[in-house]
Amino acid sequence: MPHLIAVIQARTGSTRLPRKVLRELGGRPVLEWVVTAARESNVCDAIVVATTTEPGDGAVVDLAARLGVAAVRGPVDDVLTRFLMAADAAHAVSGDAVVRLTADCPLLDPMVIAECAAVFDPARTDYVTTDHEHTVAHGFDVEIVSVDALHAIDPVATGADRAHVTPYITLHPDDFRIASVALDPPSADLRVTLDEPADAELLDAIVAELGDRATSRRDVVALLRARPDLVALNAHVAVKPLAAG
């Protein structure tokens, strides 16, 4: 069986909501929610936080230590390099894979991570994603990419492909074996990530309704379908383009 390494990209230098990954949600830092989701998936053999060398991100390293997980520090905009550093820190070898998680998605469902892990097979897949058909809310996304694929794209990926790690793979489907995990019910019209103050308002409201522990994606979607007033809180927030980094 391949080793699965959860790599959580996190930094404090967000332009729209600075220090968002350290923000309290239900009494816990947002980053802690993501670490908890990775742990409760019961499929991750290691968890590594991939942050930057910026001075302010020392706070991310300190929080990772308090949570009992490793951290690596690398270039701000070259997230691919940070992921390779994280894989090395976890002693990844050929056949192992990285579960790509972002620290601004505190409502990640551990079961979705487990579903993706069940699909990943190094003999048949290089990349597993929940978002290949664009049916999942921004904030529930999970990706698994083989360490071999990361090393393969490292010499050729540039710009946004390095900042966002996996676009090169999806743009070259003839070169990589891609599998998609469909998540029902569809939720692409919803947004449960944390980029702006309006997102924080929605996440606070969801946690107030559902509790301060990890909840299932289905419970979150059901709540938002029943409460259009909550959906309206961040419906105006635009998705940041890939080129923005």
Regions found by a protein language model. Name each.
Residues 85-90, 107-135:
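Conserved donor-nucleotide/metal-binding helix-loop-beta segment in metal-dependent transferases, i.e.
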Residues 1-17:
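N-terminal nucleotide-binding beta1-loop-alpha1 segment
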Residues 17-40:
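Short, well-formed alpha-helical segments that are part of the catalytic scaffolds
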Residues 163-245:
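Conserved alpha/beta core of the MobA/IspD/sugar-nucleotide pyrophosphorylase nucleotidyltransferase superfamily
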Residues 142-152, 197-200:
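Conserved nucleotide-sugar donor-binding
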Residues 98-99:
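Short aromatic/hydrophobic "clamp" motif used to bind/position activated sugar donors
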Residues 115-126, 146-161, 171:
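Basic phosphate/pyrophosphate-binding loop/patch that engages nucleotide-derived ligands
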Residues 32-94:
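Conserved N-terminal catalytic core of the sugar/cofactor nucleotidyltransferase
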